[in-house]
């Protein structure tokens, strides 16, 4: 095939002189250049041709990841008889004391007694998780725990924990905690979220991304696609993962990846963001961009 790019237009011809239909659901503005010959580069991989506009500055999408309310989990780690358990929220302390009666120092009973002591706390959502209590609020709050067993029988995790083993064994679906790791640097920090299994009332912590970040590429500024379809026609568009059906055939366009874990320190934006991509290549099953003095390559796929 021969591809001809003009200002705001793209044509595909066969070597026999046949012109093929090119559908353009989006992306033609990417071709709005007065010097197509000096502006565009392309590389073909199987049924896809990636086209770059060397005058286009790449950017991240303005959309941001979801954010969470302020949240914390109090955990009763062990029940000890004749011991006081305390939770202090925004400066007010709520307490319960166990006795020598075994039922009073079961962890679930201690939690129930603390929830009763706290009562209806304005602005808070409070959830009984058995041996744990989940707190959330749209406004920030302070919360600490103490106990009469050297503060070894309870703990509170709010926003951060130093080690993975410090995390509570239960939480509410979607709760995010930062694992701070070594205090001497920020490079080993990572984030985990609670993934709940509703069928077992259990769950697990899974690595995730800090909320509120711009994690996706602005596909309007990234190299675009010319895709050959089974019906002989072509489709020029953004590489945005769009799915569509044509003549009974399902298509899924390639999609540039997103930041799925970490933050802007541990998983920074690629160096080509804010730059103009000057060339594109394919090497050992990896797509590569040249921007400024950097070469950035995809994972092997």
Kindly label every feature range from the protein language model.
Residues 1, 5-53, 73-150, 172-203, ...:
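Extended, beta-strand-rich, solvent-exposed assembly scaffolds of outer structural proteins
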Residues 1-7, 269-292:
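Beta-strand-rich domains and repeat architectures in extracellular enzymes and scaffolds
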Residues 5-25, 246-249, 254-257, 262, ...:
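Beta-propeller domains
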Residues 24-40, 255-278:
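Short linear interaction motifs
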Residues 56-58:
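Short active-site loop/helix that positions an aromatic residue
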Residues 64-65:
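Post-signal-peptide, soluble extracytosolic/periplasmic N-terminal scaffold domains
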Residues 202-265:
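Long, low-complexity, polar/charged, intrinsically disordered or flexibly structured peripheral segments
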């Amino acid at each position: 095939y021969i591809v001809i790019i003009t200002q705001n237009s793209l044509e595909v011809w066969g070597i026999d002189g046949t012109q093929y239909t090119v559908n353009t659901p989006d992306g033609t503005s990417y071709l709005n250049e007065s010097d197509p010959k000096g502006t565009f580069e392309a590389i073909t991989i199987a049924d896809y041709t990636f086209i770059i506009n060397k005058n286009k500055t790449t950017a991240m999408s303005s959309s941001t990841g979801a954010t969470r309310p302020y949240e914390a989990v109090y955990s009763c780690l062990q029940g000890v008889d004749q011991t006081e358990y305390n939770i202090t929220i925004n400066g007010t302390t709520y307490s319960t004391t166990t006795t020598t009666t075994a039922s009073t120092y079961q962890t679930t009973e201690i939690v129930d007694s603390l929830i009763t002591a706290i009562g209806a706390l304005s602005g808070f959502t409070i959830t009984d998780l058995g041996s744990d209590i989940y707190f959330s609020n749209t406004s920030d709050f302070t919360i600490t725990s103490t106990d009469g067993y050297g503060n070894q029988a309870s703990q509170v995790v709010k926003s951060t924990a130093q080690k993975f083993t410090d995390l509570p064994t239960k939480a509410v679906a979607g709760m995010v905690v930062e694992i701070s790791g070594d205090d001497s640097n920020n490079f080993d920090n990572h984030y985990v979220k609670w993934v709940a299994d509703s069928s077992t009332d259990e769950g697990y912590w899974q690595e995730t991304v800090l909320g509120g970040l711009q994690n996706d590429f602005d596909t309007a500024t990234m190299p675009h696609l010319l895709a050959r379809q089974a019906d002989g026609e072509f489709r020029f568009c953004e590489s945005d993962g769009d799915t569509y059906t044509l003549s009974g055939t399902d298509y899924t366009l390639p999609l540039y990846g997103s930041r799925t874990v970490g933050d802007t320190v541990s998983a920074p934006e690629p160096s080509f963001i804010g730059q103009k991509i000057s060339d594109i290549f394919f090497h050992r099953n990896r797509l590569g961009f040249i921007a400024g003095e950097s070469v950035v390559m995809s994972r092997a796929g």
